[in-house]
Amino acid sequence: MGARAQPTPSWAREPLFEKAVTPSDVGKLNRLLVPKQHAEKHFPLRRTSSDASGVLLNFEDGEGKVWRFRYSCWNSSQSYVLTKGWSRFVREKGLRAGDTIVFSGSAYGPDKLLFIDCKKNNTAAATGDEKPITSGEATRVVRLFGMDITGGGGDCRKRERAVEMGQEAFLMKRQCVVHQRTPALGALLL
């Protein structure tokens, strides 16, 4: 593990699939969730008692470095994951949510080799190169399901006033309806 060799040229690689990493893929769970359809097609596991803890898979990156990950199926959620070795890969590659992992296999030769590469997401949010907020640009950030969601900014007081006006209009409308019904009700009682 970690050995560097002459990298396999891209023409000798056959693309298998890509996965945009999520916050949980690069977070404290220390695992990469492999989409089930790709896992079963490209990294099949034989269901035996001897490999209950998974198997070790070797992947070569674009620099010729070999990475070893434990690959297993979590029976509780029927999820396929790369675990042991994944957090080190994330750290060394500087992966962040939104980056893409590219999996490929050898296109030639009798041995089926596996390759892993990273494509960085170049948006400001993914690289941490956000510009400083100047006055008047303050935005509200809410964390929901592990994602930071920024508000559209704007003047919140306008929205609050619209809600207040909406309540007043509702009460006035309700009063008018009551007044309209009362005379008719009174006429019926006479």
From Swiss-Prot:
It is found in: Nucleus. GO terms for cellular component: nucleus. One of its GO terms (molecular function) is DNA binding. Keywords: DNA-binding, Nucleus, Transcription, Transcription regulation. SUPFAM superfamilies: DNA-binding pseudobarrel domain. SMART domains: B3. PROSITE patterns: B3. InterPro entries: B3_DNA-bd, DNA-bd_pseudobarrel_sf, LEC2-like. Residues 17-121 bind DNA. PANTHER family: AP2_ERF AND B3 DOMAIN-CONTAINING PROTEIN OS01G0141000, B3 DOMAIN-CONTAINING TRANSCRIPTION FACTOR ABI3. This is B3 domain-containing protein Os02g0764100. The lineage of its organism: Eukaryota, Viridiplantae, Streptophyta, Embryophyta, Tracheophyta.
